[in-house]
């Protein structure tokens, strides 16, 4: 079975709702979340401090999922978070597992 890694970058205002969606989703096999700084965001979406620093506070979430579940998970995210400023990219997972 082919696995993918969906990386999401979200603003702090939607972090908890996005994590809740993933926790309840049967399509998110495993995921992590990390505080990060996002660069290249639209200037209008930044507060004054972020404009001076040139970066926005954000959360990066990496989700491991089966390739067959990609469309369903992205649709669920789009449905709930349209216009919320989420960015994403998808990469193939060459190998994954648990160290036992």
Regions found by a protein language model. Give the residues of each.
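Positively charged, small/polar-rich N-terminal and surface patches that mediate targeting and assembly
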Residues: 1-100
């Amino acid at each position: 079975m082919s696995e993918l890694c969906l990386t999401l970058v979200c603003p702090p205002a939607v972090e908890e709702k996005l994590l809740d969606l993933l926790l309840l989703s049967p399509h998110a096999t495993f995921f992590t979340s990390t505080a990060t700084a996002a660069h290249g965001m639209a200037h209008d979406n930044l507060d004054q401090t972020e404009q001076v620093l040139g970066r926005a506070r954000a959360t990066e979430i990496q989700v491991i999922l089966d390739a067959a579940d990609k469309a369903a998970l992205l649709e669920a995210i789009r449905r709930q978070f349209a216009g919320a400023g989420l960015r994403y990219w998808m990469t193939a997972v060459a190998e994954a597992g648990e160290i036992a």
